[in-house]
Structures are given as structure tokens and as C-alpha cells.
Amino acid sequence: MHELPYGLYIIGSKEADGEKVNGMMADWVMQVSFNPRLVGVAFEKDAHTLGNVRKHGVFSVNLLAADKDSMELARPFAQPHSGTKVRGRKGAEATAVHYKLDGLDHRLTERGCPVLDAALAWFECEAEQYVEIGDHTLVVGRVLDGRVEREAEPMTSTYTGWTYSG
């Protein structure tokens, strides 16, 4: 499973209190329908962002470029929100990062979801289904809006060397 290549995406959400926005890295993201336009995103069942999506019903998907600047931008998003998820990590990688969008250039969609200024492309989704599958929850979202901002190769697990698998 470690050898399966995936795209790497930043999933944006409004915090439960509605005051702040946050983001997490996801690699289990896929289109599941042309008509209507639906995507699926798999979240760990205890993911902070999943709680935000359940509360507000919307999320954004940001695609990043396969380049050095985007790698640095993405690095904090690979950190967990909770310190309980840092087992086996050392040094800076063992630190929980709460508000990963703080200090990063971004804007909010009409529905309040964050879009990174550095994104190659983005889309905003309304959650339609939550499917419990093993140790993850698959959120099926209807694409409401989105745009390709620029052309470049998208970031993948093959490019970064990062893996998330069991």
C-alpha cells in the first residue's frame, strides 16, 4: 500500500465556532461522478476537519504544484491538529499544528471556505453523504464552485516522497 501514488490536497474548512478557518492535508480524494459533479474525500474518523465539515456542511479542496515553494507551504498541513496523533514522530514533526492557515495568503469563498492563493486549482463542495468505511469516513461532496488558477504539475506523494498508508 505504501507504493500507491496519490495526489496531495489541502482540505479547507470553517472551524466549528465559525470564527476561524483551517486546513488539513488529504491524499484520498477522488471524483466519484460527472453528473452531478461529486468528489469523495476520506477523513480519519477523529479528524478535526471532519468535525468542522459535519458542523458547517461545506469544505474546499486546494490543489498545489509539484515545486519547492508548494512543498514548504504544504509541510505544516502534514502535521496533526491533535498532539495525540504524533506517536512515532520526532523533532519538529512531533508538534501538533492547530491553525495551519495562519500566516498563509488565502481568501474565503462565498460560503466561508478557505482557498490558498498558491493553489493551482480549487473547488468548493457541499457535503452530501458521510459513509463510514473501516477506520475512515468518506465524505461525498457536491462541487458548487471552483477554478483552475494556473497550469503546472500537481503535487503527488511520488513527488514529495510522503506516504500515508497502512
Feature map (PLM): residue ranges:
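Basic, polyanion-binding surface patches
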Residues: 1-166
